[in-house]
Amino acid sequence: MEKEKRNQFLATGFFLFGIAFLYVPSILMVPTVIAQNAVLLKGIALVFLSIAAILVGTSFKDKQRIAVISGIGLAVGLSFLYLPVPSILSGSAFHILFACAIAFGMTTAAKQAAAIGSALLACIGIVFLYQPFFPALGGTALHLLLPGIIVFSIVFSQKTLCERISIGLIALGLIALCQPFLMLFYQTGFQLLLAGLTGFIVAAHR
């Protein structure tokens, strides 16, 4: 019981610090030193929010409430990504989607629906990655691909298949980065590699 309360306290702390590091550097009144290190602070924020999501998924008993909140968080992240919102919000979309995907995957009871939805989200991310008509959509592909892979790797019943898909993405990413012929394939190799590594790590430790 004490360990559970401690983890809940840590989850709250990591969440608050993550939010602070995510949004404080974008406020105009902050000192110059903080504003100059905004990228570093946002990187730390992603780590803190991810840790908070993992602790929330393991230490709180009301899994259904966490799943609903994190599902709303996913919707909010998508709205920040595609709706005309201030830059301080659009710049935080990836962090929100990444952290909420972890919490949602760990707590949702609708495993089958979540697996289908996350697979669809990842597929849309891949389509956005390679479509040549709207460059702005290509810039948001990783925002869809990683959360989709994370949720799918957690909720899908066949762990071995998740690992194989992830290994396939890793192989495709490496091939893309090593081949000199197709520039679009080369430019997207890192995203495929990152998605594959993320999916494999999540599937191996779920």
Spell out what each predicted region is.
Residues Q8-L22, A67-G77, A115-G125, S166-L172:
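Alpha-helical transmembrane segments
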Residues T12, L28-V30, A52, T58, ...:
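Long, leucine/valine-rich, helix-dominated scaffolding and oligomerization segments
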